[in-house]
């Protein structure tokens, strides 16, 4: 399933009255959350929290006015995911600063409404030949975002191989 197949995304993961998937700024696919506690917009590219605002309050997380939206380009502002390294790559100057997680599509794997009315989305990074050329380690990364009275973001990396892996993230 393509992450830009909004009908399929909404059929599988939407939560009526709380969560929908739609084209966002620059045509990027986004999850739009509105629940009893807050509202948020999360780009599927980078699993990037672009906005978060407590209910009936001004935004606490927002995008830069200089933000540009294009597939494969990092979004300025919000809460970007830096993975699997932070800053410049240790040995390859041509690799992107702060890793590639900000510029690739993440897959939605789970959505749920919590007992207190918060909305939780779980994303998994989608790797391809280009990302494996930069990060050839057996691993998985998930970004778990909970929109409630507070904004909770949990980045989880799992080593799925037998060799030790060193990474940096933010």
Tell me the role of every PLM-derived stretch.
Residues 155:
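Acidic (Asp/Glu) carboxylate-rich active-site/surface patches
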Residues 1-146, 150-152, 160-170:
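Surface-exposed acidic/polar loop and edge beta-strand patches at domain peripheries
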């Amino acid at each position: 399933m393509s992450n830009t197949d909004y009908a399929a995304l909404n059929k599988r993961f939407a939560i009526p009255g709380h969560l929908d998937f739609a084209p966002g700024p620059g045509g990027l696919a986004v999850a739009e959350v509105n629940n009893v506690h807050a509202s948020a917009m999360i780009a599927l590219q980078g699993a990037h929290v672009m906005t978060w605002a407590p209910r009936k309050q001004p935004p606490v997380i927002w995008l830069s006015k200089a933000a540009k939206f294009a597939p494969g380009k990092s979004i300025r502002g919000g809460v970007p995911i830096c993975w699997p390294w932070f800053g410049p790559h240790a040995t390859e100057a041509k690799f992107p600063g702060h890793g590639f997680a900000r510029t690739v599509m993440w897959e939605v794997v789970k959505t749920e409404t919590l007992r207190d009315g918060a909305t939780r989305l779980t994303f998994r990074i989608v790797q391809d030949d280009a990302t494996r050329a930069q990060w050839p380690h057996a691993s998985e990364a998930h970004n778990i975002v909970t929109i409630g009275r507070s904004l909770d973001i949990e980045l989880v990396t799992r080593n799925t191989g037998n060799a030790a892996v060193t990474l940096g993230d933010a």
